[in-house]
Amino acid sequence: MQETLVSKAWPDAPRALDKARIAKTWQQYYEDRGYELWGFSPSPTARILARAILDGNPRRSERIEIVDYGCGYGRDSLYFIELGFDVIGIDLSETAVTLARGAYKQRQASGIPLLGSASFHAGDLHSVFKCRTGQRVRAFFSNRVLHLLSEIDLRDATRDAMTCMEEGAYFCVSARSPDDFNTALMEWIPGKEHEIARYKDPARSGHNITFVTKGSLLRVVGNDLEDMQYTKASEPERVGSPDTHLLILLGRKRGRGSDAATPMEGSNPAP
């Protein structure tokens, strides 16, 4: 899913039910709206990663492989492919993966030159890379997924990400920031004020938002990354919906023996 699952506020059994409920909701979104959910314009997060890679490899002398975690129907994956990157798209939604494969085939048949390649997989990082022992990628990318992971699940996901990344690889993710809290639509989880919100709409029951901050991201990945830069951005939650306010983190996996990273404010121009 473009956005995945889970709340850290509740124990495992209810959390599993919420995960299944949200997965079903996104399956329905993809079945009902398909490519009309976001269109195919690349996200601000994808543009930031692309610019960083291209600036660091101006001659394009090496192949760049990117994991697109929560790839949805492939809108950012296709953007990366057109730039010459190779993509491993991963999503929990089988419907989304089917759509991504279909969009890729349509683009191949359109006559538009594709300098890169892609494969799309239903599952998670662990299941996909279990059969890719020793494989390392040059970049890990995730747009608007991490705010729906519990603290434990977020740590698991980032640990798996670091495992599949080579030293110096780019880590570029976005998630909803506290600026996105909307009193008309959301309410705070008791005891988790200013951290976790839930939607008031009963149709979105269990669809909780764990807002990310620089501090929360630093706690999770600060020991693994260097050259960390944060950027604020916004984009519609879906076509025709209000904007969501995002915090974007761009960093690079620290090599062995590197000193501790110093987080920086920054933004990267889009290509």
Region roles according to the model:
Residues 2-64, 72-132, 149, 156, ...:
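Class I (Rossmann-like) S-adenosyl-L-methionine-dependent methyltransferase catalytic domain
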Residues 141:
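A conserved beta-strand element that flanks and buttresses the S-adenosyl-L-methionine
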Residues 155-167:
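A short glycine-rich, Lys/Arg-flanked "PGG" loop and its adjoining helix->strand segment in the class I
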Residues 68:
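Class I SAM-dependent methyltransferase core
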Residues 144-148:
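Short catalytic micro-motifs in class I SAM-dependent methyltransferases
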Residues 64, 137-138:
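Conserved acidic residues
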